[in-house]
Amino acid sequence: DFLVPARLSPGSFYALPQSPQLFKQILMVAGLDRYYQIVRCFRDEDLRADRQQEFTQLDVEMSFVDEEDVLSLVEQMFVDVWADVLGAEVKAPFVRLPYAEAMTRYGSDKPDTRYGMELADLSEAFRRTNFRAFSTALDNGGVIKGFAAPGAASWSRQELDGLVVEAQGRGASGLVWLAFAGDDIRSPVRKHLSDEEVAAIRQASGAGDGDLALLVADQEGRANTVLDGLRRLMAERLELIPTDRWNFLWITEPPLFEWSEEEGKWVSVHHPFTSPATEDVALETATARAYDIVLNGWELGGGSIRIHRPDVQRKVFEALGVAADEAEEKFGFLLTAFRYGVPPHGGIAIGLDRTAMVLAGAENIREVIPFPKTQSGTDLLTGAPAAVDEAQLRDLGIQLRGSTRHQP
C-alpha cells in the first residue's frame, strides 16, 4: 500500500486504493446490481514493462451472475473495441484454458498461443536414467520438461551457450540441449543418454530433423518459469510470431491458494473474497471461480465470482490463518454487511493502460502513460518521491527514523 498520513488523526494513515474491491462488493449488498467505473489504482510494487505503480482500470461488478455472464460481456467489449480501433475481426467466444493445462502446455498462466513449441513432460521417460543431473532432479521431487525449437539445430556452439546463460539467468541450474540433424545428434550430454532416452525426447517434444530440443530438470515451478522465458525468446529469435493475429483466451480454474516463500505462509492467489469452486477450501487442492483474460502473452484483466456466504468467507479466512478478531478488525464492515444477505455476484477489472499498450503496438506501458514513473518509481518531471519539509512532518505528527529521507 501507498500510505497517506491523516493530519486530523495523528498517527493514523489512509491507504491509496489498490482496487475498489470491497467497496463494489458493498454496493452489491446495498442493491446496486450493476457497477461500472473507470478507476485510478495504486500499488507499491516493482515496475515491469507491463506494470506501473499508478494505473487505470475499467472496474465491473454485477449481481446475480455466473462466470459465463461476465466472460460474454467482456468478450463482446473486446470484439467491439478491436473492430472500432484496429478494424480487426475478433471472434467470440474466446478459448477457455484451465490454469493447470496452461502451466502444463506453456509453463505460464498468460501464454502466447500464436506459435507452437508447447512444453513436454519427460519425467517418466527418465525415471531409470543414469544421467545424474536428471536423476538428482527427479529424486528431489522435480520434473524434466522441455520443448523443440524448429530449425535451430544449426545454431553455433556460441549461440547455444548463450541459451544456457539465459536459462541460468532465469533461475535454472543448467540447460540441456540436443540438436537433431538427420542421424547426427549434437549435444554435450549425448554420451550420458541412451538411444531410448534420445528417442523419447524426440517423440515427446516433436523434434524433427533440423530442430533443437531444450530441456530443464528442476522443481516444476522453476522449470516452468525458465521454459516459458526460453519459449518466448526462441519465438522472437526464430521470427515465429505473427504480428496480425489476436489470440484472446481465458485462463480459468486457478488455484485458490498458493504458498508464499517470502511470507512463509499460504496466501490467496487473487484475493480472499474469491469464491472457491466447491465448499472444500483445502489449501493445496482448492480451485477458484476466477478468470484472467490474456492476449498474445499479456494479461489484460482478471476477475472472479465472489464469496457471498458468511460461512464460506470465514472458512477462507481460517484457511489463510486469519484469526476471527483480526478478520473483524480489518473486514468488519464487510462481514457485518454479509449478515443482511448478499446476492451472488462477480466481476472483473480490465487494465486500460495495458490494453492501450497492446492496441498501440508498444512494448512498454510507459509509452501510453503521460508522465510515467521510471523503473525505480521516480517521476522525472517533479522529482517525486522527494524529501518533505520538517514543519510539514511536525503537522502530521511524523518523525523519521535515522537518515531515511529520499534524495531525488
What are these regions (language model features)?
Residues 1-408:
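Class II aminoacyl-tRNA synthetase catalytic cores and aaRS-like
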